[in-house]
Amino acid sequence: MRILFVTANRVGDAVLSTGILAHLAAKYPTAEITVAAGPAAISLFRTLPNLHRLIVMEKKRYGAHWLSLWRDCVASRWDIIVDLRRSALAYCLMAGQRFIIPKAKREMHRVELLASTIGLGATPPAPTLWLENSTEDETEGGQKIAIAPAANWIGKQWSAERFAELAGRLSAPTGLFANARIAVFAAEAERDQVQALFDNLPKDSYDDLVGVGDLSDVAHLLSRCNFFVGNDSGLMHMSAALGVPTLGLFGPSRTEHYAPWGPKCGYVRTKKSYEEIVGAPGYDHRTTGSLMGGLTVDAVESAARQLVERIGTSQ
């Protein structure tokens, strides 16, 4: 049996699609699964148990990347094609079943929308990541707080200085995670965005995990953390999918669509709503700076405490 799974370019959207992929992999354990995704997200799927092939979709002018993907896939007859990009590809290939993501609904979380593609919108499978077996000694003591201070757009980016203050509070001897180490995650290309965080932390208090490896490596390191706090980003969704207690910071993005998914997740947002932020006079996403200034360190620390208390109460 052959399954073609066409998913997102962006890491966060690709992570959110892993729930339905995991469902298909479990339902058809002997299937050969081919995953097509953008270069930023493709390594998420390297450890998928049923994986047959990965196809990197490098964006090309005039949509030529779709022609390239068709050429890669046309010689096979697919039992199932799942297209989460709403392209015409599925209708140009031989397939037993075709599942195309429906149009987005305003109030539907992305996980629910993705699940509705294969008829599971009422009971959406949670995103999941597949960790490689490791021979490393993972018995090191002490707690770790994962901090992800970058974002794919400056408007969504809380200031690195505030992240540093928050990290200091959470890891203080009397903090929520007393004497925890700070694990800082970002892509290597984002180092300049997060440098101010390093500049404001004691040098012996953190692990610099910027650009540490591909996304499978990052997932392994994230899974060893006790708590995650970061902007609305792919790393936030990875942490949630790994079952790490996850607090997402939101401003100019919709929590109803992209809040971290799972029982150990929460979010805190600016006092201004998404509509108030993007509807403000003079707003232009191309030229704006950070739109997260209305979110205070006090508010984020309080949200972290509330999330930890809620998780502890529910266990």
Put a short name on every predicted segment:
Residues M1-Q315:
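Catalytic machinery of carbohydrate-active enzymes
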